[in-house]
Amino acid sequence: MRTSVCIKGTGSNFMRMSLMGLMLTVMSQVNAQQFNSDSWLSKPHGVMTIIPTFGERSSMLMNTFSLLPRWEFTMAAYLYNSDKDNTTDDGYSTSFYAKYMIYENPMQNGGFAVKAGTGTFPGTIDPDLREKDAFKTYWMNAPITIPFYDNKLSWDIMPGASFTRNFGPEETTAWSFTYSTRVAYNPWGPKFSVVGELFGTEGETGTLPEYKVGLRYDVSPNATFAFTYGQEFTDNNGAGFEIGAMLFTPPFVKIGKGEKQKHEYQ
């Protein structure tokens, strides 16, 4: 998960236009991944990942920096379009978090990690809360990746927990359990995958469970495109159609010397 900052009015309009302009600039060179689930993998030391996503409910620009071996540091901005009307301002939010890869198997196709931060991914917190002040919701989760069938099937599991400060009229601390799981199936080779995902939150700040299905195409070890459709199981306020990309830079943004790694990014 991740927390929310949402501001409306003139300042929000300026931020909205600035972020959209930056997204459009980046999108001309990149490819995306708009899933809530994550894998065990931390990108090789020094790699910067740029992830723009355009969708019906929200659009996103996420930047991840692998400044240290096994570590990733991420910041993201989300532009909301709750009423499906692009001419109105539905606010924006931000999230900041870190990830540490604890274990990787000898085949380098599975393992587990831990993530922690503030700011929520769209669909993982009550919509009313994402429009409150920043740094109210904090979270931690553990991405686990298990490969099957000679690496043709990859299963990501990501249990976690969150707490929101000053929740409700009594301004209590609200706790929730977060869950997310994703399956990627690539019977035609490693580049093309069919992906399905389920995620949600149970607790005081809970949400309706959502699903997301789509196609992911790994153009190269440095670029991945994804086209998805997401919806709530019992309502129609899900993500809708989304198109996104991931771009991985050469390893130049780093602190110190790192380990030699050989990966296809996920």
Q: At which residue positions do the language-model features occur?
A:
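Transmembrane beta-barrel domains of Gram-negative outer membranes and organellar outer membranes
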Residues: A32-P169, A174-T228, E232-Q266
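Cleavable N-terminal export/targeting peptides
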Residues: M1-N36, F252-Q266
